[in-house]
Regions:
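A short, Lys/Arg-rich alpha-helix, primarily the initiator
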Residues: 1-19
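Short, charged recognition helix plus adjacent turn
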Residues: 2-3, 63, 70-89
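Residues at secondary-structure transition points
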Residues: 4-8, 37, 48, 52
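Residue-level detection of the helix-turn-helix DNA-binding "recognition helix"
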Residues: 6, 18, 32-33, 48, ...
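Residue-level signal for the short linker/turn that defines the boundary of a DNA-recognition helix
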Residues: 11, 21-22, 38, 53-56
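Hydrophobic packing within well-folded, soluble alpha/beta domains
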Residues: 13, 17, 27, 61-62, ...
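Short alpha-helical DNA-recognition segment
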Residues: 20-46
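DNA major-groove recognition helix of helix-turn-helix/homeodomain DNA-binding modules
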Residues: 50, 54-71
């Protein structure tokens, strides 16, 4: 079985960042202004689905990207059924 990503929001963060015309460096700087000390490398890992994002971080992302929390999630995540079947493991 293919390993599922550690987060579902990464691709949407990347899409919203690009739509806002921001580089990873610029978004990381804006996140830092809003209270999240995140490097460009950390943001890259989030966008790639390799780093988890906790609840507080989701709020900062939504605020910084000027979107609703629901805007950070895909409309239909591809791997939800496997996560549910495996008990989130």
């Amino acid at each position: 079985m293919a390993e599922s990503p550690q987060n579902l929001v990464g691709p949407q963060v990347r899409r919203l960042r690009i739509e806002a015309g921001l580089s990873q460096e610029a978004l990381a700087a804006k996140l830092q202004v809003n209270g999240w000390d995140l490097s460009r490398a950390g943001l890259s890992k989030i966008e790639a689905g390799l780093r988890r994002v906790n609840d507080a971080e989701l709020w900062v992302l939504a605020k910084t990207l000027r979107c609703q929390l629901t805007g950070l999630y895909p409309s239909k995540p591809a791997n939800v059924s496997s996560v549910v079947r495996n008990g989130g493991k």
